[in-house]
Amino acid sequence: MLVIHPKDKSTSLAETIYANMPNVHVVEDEWYKRGIGQLLWQTPKEEPILIIGYGDCRGLYRERFNDVLEISPSDLDNPVWVQRLANCQIGTPQIVLNRIHAYNLRRHNGNIIGIWPNAVEFARRNRLHGLFASTFFFNAKDAENYGEITLDMYIERSNYTLYRTLGKLLASHVPLCKIPEKLQQRAYNDTCVNHRNFESFFCL
């Protein structure tokens, strides 16, 4: 499995999905700078692709943007942090996966899992098939954007359950078309999870 998961503190818990899977190749940060088009082209058609992070209907961001950056004064001496701060002020996300990559993704015959906000709309626009999330909360601030008031602790605990469940389903080679129903069943059996995330998956 090829895993496209740009490093971000808000989404790091999602590593639980693939942490114990065999034959997982996680894309290194340098590919996001160079562009992942060549990597997608070199990936065998039969290999599944898992995509996780922040994004919208246009594609996947390299990192969360337009938010509070946790930096110390010493970080301002680092050109990388200065560039990140500038990007945050501009409010323009750096998209690392977009419609240009749709052709290479379509080669994988629907064996794609996309977990980011509006991933399902991105898939529909680009005629992709697989398992995609519609809305997804990585933390309480994400939920607030959709009018839901909650706590980070609650979202993280709920997502950990979701990630473990999804990871087991993928490792067991459960068909993607059956996963939305199984995630919903898992949510119905647990009153302590955020049902919206569990119910946000659609198979296209």
How should each PLM-predicted stretch be described?
Residues 110-204:
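Active-site-proximal C-terminal subdomain of hydrolase catalytic domains
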Residues 34-37, 57-59, 101, 120-124:
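Short, well-ordered alpha-helical microsegments
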Residues 11-13, 58-63, 122-124, 140-142:
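Extracytoplasmic/secreted cell-surface and envelope-processing proteins
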Residues 56-108:
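A short, glycine/acidic-enriched catalytic loop
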Residues 18, 63-67, 127-129:
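Short, glycine/charged-enriched secondary-structure capping and boundary segments
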Residues 1-52, 72, 76-80, 113-115, ...:
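A domain-level signal for caspase-like cysteine endopeptidase catalytic cores
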Residues 5-7, 48-64, 132-137:
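Short loop/turn segments at strand-loop or loop-helix junctions that form parts
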